């Protein structure tokens, strides 16, 4: 996206193919920046940004393509062009229908912890016990995903390093990442 965390991501298709050549197994593509402070992007704009990238990658490689979106319309369009994984920074909270779509298609789903919306998520980075809070949130989202028909082996949890957390919270989560939802 034009306002991504990482300037290098703006190369899209060519960068993805270079990373695959260098051994990447999964390429994550997003049409809406979810960095702290980012502005909302419409589903139509997300689709316009990501579909050419997906098409070019899929034409050249069988590497898994993950799509970073919170919108059902976007993942539908992406899967129809060959995307394999839903990476939802809202952990299936922002769009009620996205979980049913993922279950129906049998695609893996990444559920990420964050606080609030990207535009303001860094405004509240204090936690009583960051590990317990993030773990409890992710466990509740896993339960929700299961209740919507997503298979247990298709669910991946992401503690959301850098999303609504300060340095110390990030350090604690990285140190204990293997214990999440355990």
Residue ranges and their predicted role:
Residues 2-20, 45-48, 91-96, 132-138, ...:
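Glycine-rich anion/phosphate-binding loops
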Residues 2-6, 25-52, 161-167:
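Glycine-rich, proline-tolerant flexible connector loops at the mouths of alpha/beta enzymes
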Residues 39-67, 73-76, 103-114, 136, ...:
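Alpha-helix-loop-beta-strand connector modules within alpha/beta enzyme cores
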Residues 124-182:
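Catalytic alpha/beta core domains of metabolic enzymes, predominantly
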Residues 1-14, 39, 64-66, 122-132:
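Active-site mouth loops of central-metabolism enzymes
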Residues 63-70, 75, 84-95, 131-137:
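Catalytic beta/alpha-barrel core
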Residues 25-31, 87, 107-116, 159:
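Non-cysteine beta-strand/loop elements that form the S-adenosyl-L-methionine
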Residues 10-29, 59-60, 64, 76-85, ...:
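Alpha/beta enzyme core
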